[in-house]
Amino acid sequence: MMKDFIKLKDKNNIVTIEKGELISFKVDGSEYIHQKGSKGWRKSDDEMFPIIGPVSKNNFRVHTKKGDAIQDQHGLLREMDYVLISSDEKTAKFSKKYVKNTKLINSKYPEKSTEEKLFWPFDFTFEKHFYLENNTLKINFIITAEAGMPFMLGYHPAFLLSSSGTDTLVANGKKITLKEIYEVGHNAFPVLNTDKIILENSDRNHLEISTTNFNNFMLWTEVDNMLCIEPISQYTSYTDEKFSEENMRISSGKEEFSITIKVL
């Protein structure tokens, strides 16, 4: 049976993982991850797969060459539990394995959705690997599936802010304020065609968040103590595009993505 909590340690850095969810990243005693139970969001990280965004505008249907799949906001991966593959002092590896057309209970039903069960017409294995070293946490995502499977991928970590409302971000050479992010609301603020964002904390060291293969971010918050900085393979909120494989990435069989969170 998997331990609920795993701690990774390196010098003055401690990462805490709960059943595959990143719930703490402390460097020299300072916390950088939003704490569950605080105002804002009930989680501290999540993965969006194989869909990003609200599928309700598409009647919860995603068109694929194997027929229409039923998905809810941000996909069905979040309805599955991680299994621990291995861990040691500085690394931990988790996976989720899905068998095509398996119906999963939708936790959004009935309060926020009309769909009681979700399914996807492709097999896949989704791995999440954590590596801690020198003030830096790297997380790799490895998706193994049949070649030709359409997908989107997003990672949804929540970072702790100062509660002052004065924390800022820098991306593509431009400064972004929390006020700008609030104004976009639930659609999330797009930061496209970049693989790096700096979070300028007003009360702690800054964070550099860099990625591979995502090439986009979206930013979301409704509170001043937390900010979701989400690497995404594509941004779906402002389009009227149908959720269809024509508008998604297509798997080569094995796809790898990563995020690196570095304390500056």
Model regions and ranges:
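Asparagine-centered strand-capping/turn motif at beta-strand->loop junctions
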Residues: F141-A147
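Short, hydrophobic/aromatic alpha-helical segments in well-folded domains
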Residues: T125-F126, N140, G154
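Surface-exposed beta-strand/loop patches in extracellular or lumenal glycoproteins
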Residues: L153-F159
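Surface-exposed acidic/polar loop and edge beta-strand patches at domain peripheries
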Residues: M1-T136, M149, L160-L264
